[in-house]
C-alpha cells in the first residue's frame, strides 16, 4: 500500500474533491518525490528522508492555501512543452492550446505574427517552434511576465522578439506590420469574481485576468483598432474570449470593419474563440 499517497489524499480531504486530490497525490509522488509512475499505480510506498518529509509538509501547506500545483512545481505543460510559470503569469489553459492548434491548421508557414499579452509566452513560443520560418513578436505590459517569457523562449530555443507594450495606450509605428494578431487578453469581469475558484482568484495575476464590468471588451476593441493599422490586407485576428461575450465581440469586430467574422466553440461547447479578416483598399 502506498502510505504516502494515502496520507496526501487524506490531508487534502475537504479542500479538494477526491479526483483532484488523487491527481495531486500522483503529481507529488512522481514529479516531486521521484517515484516511478508504474510503482505509484502498483501501490508501492515511498521511503522518505527527513528532508523529503519536510518538503512534503511544505507542499501540503501550500496546497491547503489553494496555491496551484503549477506554481509549486514552477512549471506547466502546453502542447507537449514545459513552460516556467510563477504567480507573475497566468497558468496556460487547455482552451489556449485549442486556439494555437487552430492557428497552426490555418496559418501560412511564413507569417508575421504578433501575440498581445503573451504572459508565459506559451502562444508565441509554440507558434515560433511550429512555424520556424515565421517572424513572431510578443507584447506584454508586465516586465515580470516578459522576463519569464524570454526565459521560456531561451530554454525552448524559440525565435521570438519580446517587447514591453501597454496595448491600451500604444500608438503603432511603420515597423508594426503583421499578417496575424493573436490575443488572449484579460476578460473576466469583476462581477464574475464570486464564481472563481480560490486557486485562480487568490494566486493568479489580477492584471492578466480582470476587466471592468462597464467595459468587458476594452482590450478586444483596442486590439481591433490597432489591427486596422497594423494588419496587412487579408490579415487575421484570433481572439480567445469570455464565453459570455461572444456575440458582443463579433458585433464589435463587424462594426470596426472586419470581415468573415466567426465565433467558434471550445471542446466544452462554450463560445471561446473569435476569428476574423481585415481587407483594406489598395
Model-derived features: positions:
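Active-site beta-alpha loop architecture of Rossmann-like, nucleotide-cofactor-dependent enzymes
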Residues: 70, 188-191, 244
Amino acid at each position: 500500500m502506498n502510505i504516502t499517497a494515502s496520507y496526501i489524499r487524506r490531508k487534502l480531504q475537504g479542500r479538494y474533491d477526491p479526483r483532484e486530490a488523487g491527481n495531486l497525490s500522483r503529481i507529488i509522488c512522481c514529479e516531486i518525490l521521484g517515484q516511478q509512475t508504474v510503482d505509484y499505480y502498483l501501490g508501492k510506498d515511498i521511503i522518505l528522508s527527513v528532508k523529503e518529509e519536510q518538503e512534503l509538509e511544505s507542499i501540503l501547506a501550500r496546497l491547503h492555501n489553494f496555491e496551484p500545483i503549477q506554481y509549486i512545481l514552477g512549471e506547466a505543460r502546453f502542447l507537449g512543452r514545459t513552460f516556467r510559470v510563477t504567480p507573475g503569469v497566468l497558468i496556460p489553459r487547455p482552451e489556449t492550446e485549442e486556439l494555437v492548434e487552430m492557428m497552426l491548421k490555418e496559418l501560412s508557414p511564413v507569417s508575421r505574427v504578433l501575440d498581445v499579452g503573451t504572459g508565459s509566452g506559451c502562444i508565441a513560443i509554440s507558434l515560433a517552434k511550429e512555424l520556424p520560418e515565421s517572424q513572431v513578436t510578443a507584447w506584454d505590459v508586465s516586465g515580470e511576465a516578459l522576463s519569464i517569457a524570454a526565459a521560456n523562449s531561451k530554454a525552448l530555443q524559440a525565435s521570438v522578439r519580446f517587447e514591453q507594450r501597454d496595448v491600451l495606450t500604444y500608438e503603432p509605428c511603420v515597423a508594426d506590420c503583421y499578417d496575424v494578431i493573436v490575443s488572449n487578453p484579460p476578460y473576466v469581469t469583476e462581477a464574475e469574481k464570486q464564481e472563481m475558484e480560490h486557486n485562480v482568484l487568490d494566486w493568479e495575476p489580477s492584471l492578466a485576468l480582470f476587466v471592468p464590468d462597464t467595459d468587458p471588451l476594452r482590450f478586444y476593441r483596442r486590439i481591433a483598432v490597432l489591427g486596422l493599422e497594423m494588419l496587412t490586407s487579408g490579415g487575421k485576428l484570433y481572439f480567445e474570449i469570455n464565453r459570455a461575450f461572444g456575440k458582443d465581440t463579433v458585433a464589435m469586430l463587424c462594426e470596426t470593419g472586419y470581415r468573415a467574422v466567426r465565433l467558434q466553440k471550445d471542446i466544452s461547447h462554450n463560445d471561446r474563440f473569435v476569428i476574423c479578416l481585415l481587407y483594406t483598399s489598395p
